[in-house]
Amino acid sequence: ITGSNLVADGINNDRGMNEMIDSFLDGLNTFKAEREACLIYGSEPEVPMTRVEQMVAEMSLRDKVTQMLMVDFRDWNSKDFTVMNDEVRQIIEDYNFGSIILFADNIKETEQSYNLTMAMQEAATKDGGLALIICADQEGGSVYRLGSGTALPGNMALGATYANNGTKYAYEAGKIIGSELGILGINGNLAPVVDVNNNANNPVIGLRSYGDDATMVGELAAASIAGMAEYNVIGTAKHFPGHGDTATDSHYGLPMVDKSLDVLMETELAPYTVAIEQGIEMIMTAHILYPQQESDKIVSNKTGKEESLPATMSDDILTGLLKEDMGFEGIIVTDAMNMAGIADKWDQVQSCVIAIQAGVDLICMPCRLYCQADLANLDKIIDGIIAAVEDGTIPMERVNDAVTRILTVKENRGILDYNAEDYTLEKAQAVVGCDANREMERELAAAAVTGFIAKENVVGTLAVCFVGLENLIDTEELAMLEGAGAEVAGVLAITKVAA
């Protein structure tokens, strides 16, 4: 090999290397240009969509909006709605509702309840429709919907078991509720109440609360939610940010809680922090004013005046506090929108639009739906929400986020894969109100019994209500109460102690 050949080979090698470098640089420039285009136009390199993302992308705007509604058929044509009829079946088939709420008027007996929920899901899933979140307020105690179910004591009784038993009985109660609802096809429970009972004049919470200790309330609520989740029943913490420290019932008026965020974090919000850490999937809002957290006012179409925004309609509270600061990724559902706390001051369309803007994902009972004529009002609400999306009042991203949250919970709880063959009447009859559940009910009630030791004149300062003491009439225990100054009235032993 001559020297000239070596030089020539070197030149050729340099040319080849230069060509390779040029090719690499061309490719790099192309990649950079494509990446810049992605950033400019908001697109990203293709990533496979999740199942839920694909479903949301393929849904019409109307179907997205109706998926954000939880409706009730509490009665139909002035009669309790307990058996599916052709009118309601057609409504469910046509509207693609996300959820239906049931009341005691709807679920009286096991076989009847089973047949009703199965018929609802059959109508909802016809022709490829999405299965429903079917809910009830099965709190236990005074708020109790399932007529044939196990009649568990209320939350305050569970609170009474906490000192000696920790969260044991709250978990067992959650399991009983979850097993009985779930086997009937009721896959959502609008419970537990996680309000802290820190106002003795509260007319609506009281015994529905676990108690006045925020830490205890959070732990018991988390245990109850975990028990329900074992049976794929969605638990709901309510009423955010807190309905405990009020003297007004939001069913009949608009309460106010005037507290700083620091104070709320120590009391009202503490149980929600625990519930969110435990993976709670649904939180219900409160129709309550929180002026230190939301000071904005909006002119109401109903009153013609500027009205303060309750938590249900507050962006600062629902999006800023609950979703962003507290990290909640589940479904925000309203309390019933026909309650006076909302309905007295806002028309139905405006209240729903503002609530969705604020961060609500699921609207509970936007209007009554008790006869065929009520559909006109429902259509007005749906059309009003659609119009608000189309004119930009409600961003499409907000709607997509809401529907994504709803479908994600449905996917996680197996509702998207609903199969009627997973349910049988025989299974339901074997579980609802079964002997094992009744035995746990009695054990829980016994564990909740609390003794009070009276020291001079203490009893005389208390007003006490004993419920279910019919077995104590004419017994030594009752004589002891009377001897302590109690005045006993009635077979149910409602006792009123003289002050």
Annotate each predicted stretch with a short phrase.
Residues 17-93, 314-315, 324, 343-499:
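Preference for extracellular/luminal or secreted protein segments
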Residues 60, 83-84, 109-128, 132, ...:
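Second-shell residues forming the walls of enzyme active-site clefts
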Residues 93-104, 291-292:
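A short aromatic-anchored loop/beta-hairpin motif
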